[in-house]
From Swiss-Prot:
Biased amino acid composition, Acidic residues: 318-331
Subunit structure: Interacts with THRB (via ligand-binding domain). Interacts with RELA and REL. Interacts with COMMD1. Interacts with inhibitor kappa B-interacting Ras-like NKIRAS1 and NKIRAS2.
Regions of compositional bias (Basic and acidic residues) in chain numbering: 298-308
Protein name: NF-kappa-B inhibitor beta
Gene name of this polypeptide: Nfkbib
Length: 359
């Protein structure tokens, strides 16, 4: 495990790289270099100790600020690291601070990290972006924040993340540790716009987009958010070619199905084996599914459409296919104030299937 054992010792360049910040480049620890500690003044001699700290689980100080929901410390860290790669350092589970904030459903933290320049396309060990994770835990406000265009300029110490004196007045005497030596305003706006939109098409290691995840979880509110943001309503998942309509039918989520149809999803779409959403609906006990599809012009299935595809062998054919892999991250809830006031959310208590309510 990576980690810095002693906070009381001066960290040299080797310790800095060993701490997990080596990804910032060999010059990151050199005074005047392009990394996180560029142009350090004597007042910032503490910076390598704080920003170089990593636990045995790979969590940085920024991860810990999110896990413990310590907003003053989070604001302090962001004041010096906004716009740098430090925001996207990953722990041993591949999670960035933004992933953790989404899992915990902390919308204000997501907003601060996003505004500071945290990457929204970074994936954790299951291939999930922060938006995927927000969809899995039904964190609607977090998803809403991530689906907004990023602010024009990452916040830095001269913006909202300022240290304050005892009388609560901003202290602007320090310079941000993080600097962008060669900003390119012409390209930044285009990249920001592309960045948040690309989230909608990002696939996890199961081939699911955030919309697929929201449909599998039968979350109509999240589906509406993604639809309003421009998600592709007809994109098939790669294993069997199921579109969001197919997934809604397989989950017997009539409300989600109605929402997708009203939004313009194609009722004639076919899985790789040839089955239409109506063909799948006729294998389910809920008659509302077929009625909704017929009302929106779904064609009656031919005999060949009724044959079982490689992905389905019963009326609950999605039960085994719509599950995410891997264990969840109970440590991030055990150490947060959330666990003191209410039961841990389901994604942190046990492995989280993509279909929490199998038919």
């Amino acid at each position: 495990m990576a980690g810095v054992a002693c906070l009381g010792k001066t960290a040299d360049a080797d310790e800095w790289c060993d701490s997990g910040l080596g990804s910032l480049g060999p010059d990151a620890a050199a005074p005047g270099g392009p990394g996180l500690v560029a142009e350090l003044s004597p007042e910032l001699s503490w910076a390598p100790l704080v920003f170089g700290y990593v636990t045995e689980d790979g969590d940085t100080a920024l991860h810990l600020a999110v896990i413990h929901q310590h907003e003053p410390f989070l604001d302090f860290l962001l004041g010096f690291s906004a716009g740098t790669e430090y925001l996207d350092l990953q722990n041993d589970l591949g999670q960035t601070a933004l992933h953790l904030a989404a899992i915990l459903g902390e919308a204000s933290t997501v907003e601060k990290l996003y505004a500071a320049g945290a990457g929204v396309l970074v994936t954790e060990r299951g291939g999930h972006t922060a938006l995927h994770l927000a969809c899995r835990v039904r964190a609607h406000t977090c998803a809403y924040v991530l689906l907004q265009p990023r602010p024009s300029h990452p916040r830095d110490a001269s913006d909202t993340y300022l240290t304050q004196s005892q009388d609560h007045t901003p202290d602007t005497s320090h310079a941000p540790v993080a600097t962008d030596p060669q900003p390119n305003p012409g390209n930044e706006e285009e990249l920001r716009d592309e960045d948040w939109r690309l989230q909608l098409e990002a696939e996890n290691y199961d081939g699911h987009t955030p919309l697929h995840v929201a449909v599998i979880h039968k979350d109509a509110e999240m589906v509406q958010l993604l639809r309003d943001a421009g998600a592709d309503l007809n994109k098939p998942e790669p294993t069997c070619g199921r579109t969001p309509l197919h997934l809604a039918v397989e989950g017997q989520a009539a409300g989600v199905l109605a929402l997708l149809l009203k939004a313009g999803a194609d009722p004639t779409a076919r899985m790789y084996g040839g089955r239409t959403p109506l063909g799948s609906a006729l294998l389910r006990p809920n008659p509302v599914l077929a009625r909704l599809l017929r009302a929106h012009g779904a064609p009656e299935p031919e005999d060949k459409d009724d044959k079982l595809s490689p992905c389905s062998n019963s009326s609950s054919d999605s039960d085994s296919d719509n599950r995410d892999e891997g264990d969840e991250y109970d440590d991030i809830v055990v150490h947060s104030r959330r666990s003191q006031n209410q039961p841990p959310p389901s994604p942190a208590a046990k492995p989280l299937p993509d279909d929490p309510n199998p038919a």
